[in-house]
């Protein structure tokens, strides 16, 4: 118990130390925004992984794997009629990749591979040439190569050991781009920059920084904040669009984000931003533990009787109440908020419950994000 509390206090201390920087931090535009015309595109394909050591799909349970093997062999000129395949060295997989903006034919991207059937491991396998298509149905890349699997699995007659995921992996630089996305970047007259974390203050500040640069370089304003996420930049007549974008993305802008508390109930992780404030509120936290114990007793019949052995149930219920400490929270600063929460001495799940209750009471002046 003491070790858990110490770890929890250390976690809060690290979070507090990380948030000692000013609320308004200076960042380059390339670090906080991206070009709307330069977004990523998703690719997907279906393929086969070969060379597995008996850890592939069982063809009876995965008929699509058998069909794919036969189709591949027929394309290679090998007849499979009249034969029954019993191999366990092949697995059917889905292959995904991200096509970066302005990618040219011949460049390479990483691909992710995931099993479709009942294969137990893809370790040591090789992805056979697989076409990757976009949402429009066009083929943009072809993937092939050895799969890297980080997890492992070992199994014996009476025990098994596994760590990580063995049915998914990656092929570094495994896809070659064959077709480039149509782009009108050079022919465009406007640029739209999109903030990764939408905020009106940051958008207005970004437009002001761009206009300050444009006034000195071109003698006029060229940027306008459209909303909390988008900033429109108009291309000057004599400017080169690529060089203009290179100059803009290196400008420094003051970024700002709203006060936010992020809670992950599955892992017990809590992240509290520096701008989070709590109005004065009293919090009492206590835990009720109920333990139910079953100790059945075997009852034997009397000698020479015709009775039968029976099991008599015996249930014991114990209830214990811990905690109940009342603390006054007045989070005028992150330091006082963390100190107030730690003074109660609760576990992470208790902190989550307290934050939710404070938000319901209207005392938490921040957005509460539950994951």
Curated annotation (Swiss-Prot):
Endpoints of the signal sequence: 1-25
Subcellular location per the Swiss-Prot or TrEMBL entry: Periplasm; Bacterial flagellum basal body
Molecular functions (GO terms): structural molecule activity
Cross-referenced InterPro entries: Flag_FlgI
A biological process term (GO) from this entry: bacterial-type flagellum-dependent cell motility
GO cellular component, one term: bacterial-type flagellum basal body, distal rod, P ring
Function: Assembles around the rod to form the L-ring and probably protects the motor/basal body from shearing forces during rotation.
Assembly and binders: The basal body constitutes a major portion of the flagellar organelle and consists of four rings (L,P,S, and M) mounted on a central rod.
NCBIfam families per record: PRK05303.1
Name used for this protein in its record: Flagellar P-ring protein
């Amino acid at each position: 118990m003491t070790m858990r509390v110490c770890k929890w206090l250390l976690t809060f201390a690290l979070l507090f130390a990380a948030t000692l920087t000013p609320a308004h931090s200076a960042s380059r535009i390339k670090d906080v925004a991206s070009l709307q015309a330069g977004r990523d595109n998703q690719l997907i394909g279906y393929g086969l992984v070969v060379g597995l050591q008996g850890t592939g799909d069982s063809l009876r349970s995965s008929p699509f794997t058998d069909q794919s093997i036969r189709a591949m062999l027929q394309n290679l000129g090998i007849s499979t009629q009249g034969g029954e395949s019993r191999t366990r060295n092949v697995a059917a997989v889905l292959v995904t990749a991200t096509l970066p903006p302005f990618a040219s034919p011949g460049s390479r991207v990483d691909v992710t591979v995931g099993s479709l059937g009942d294969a137990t491991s893809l370790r040591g396998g090789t992805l056979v040439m697989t076409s990757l298509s976009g949402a429009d149905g066009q083929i943009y890349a072809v993937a092939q190569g050895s799969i890297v699997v980080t997890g492992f699995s070992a199994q014996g007659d009476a025990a098994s050991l596994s760590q990580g995921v063995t049915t998914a992996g990656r092929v570094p630089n495994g896809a070659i781009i064959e077709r480039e996305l149509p782009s009108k970047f050079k022919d465009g007259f406007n640029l739209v920059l999109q903030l990764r974390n939408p905020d009106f203050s940051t958008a207005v500040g970004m437009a002001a920084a761009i206009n300050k640069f444009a006034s000195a370089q071109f003698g006029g304003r060229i940027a306008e904040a459209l909303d909390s996420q988008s900033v429109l930049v108009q291309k000057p007549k004599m400017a080169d669009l690529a060089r203009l974008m290179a100059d803009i993305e290196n400008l420094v802008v003051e970024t700002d984000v709203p006060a936010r508390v992020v809670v992950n109930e599955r892992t017990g992780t809590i992240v509290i931003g520096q701008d989070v404030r709590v109005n004065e509120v009293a919090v009492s936290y206590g835990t009720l533990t109920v333990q139910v114990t079953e100790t059945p007793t075997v009852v034997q019949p009397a000698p020479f009787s015709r009775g039968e052995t029976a099991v008599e149930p015996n249930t014991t219920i114990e209830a214990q109440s811990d905690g109940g400490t009342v603390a006054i929270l007045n989070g005028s600063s992150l330091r006082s908020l963390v100190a107030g929460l730690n003074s109660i001495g609760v576990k992470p799940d208790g902190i989550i419950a307290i934050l939710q209750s404070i938000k319901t009471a209207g005392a938490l002046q921040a957005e509460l994000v539950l994951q």
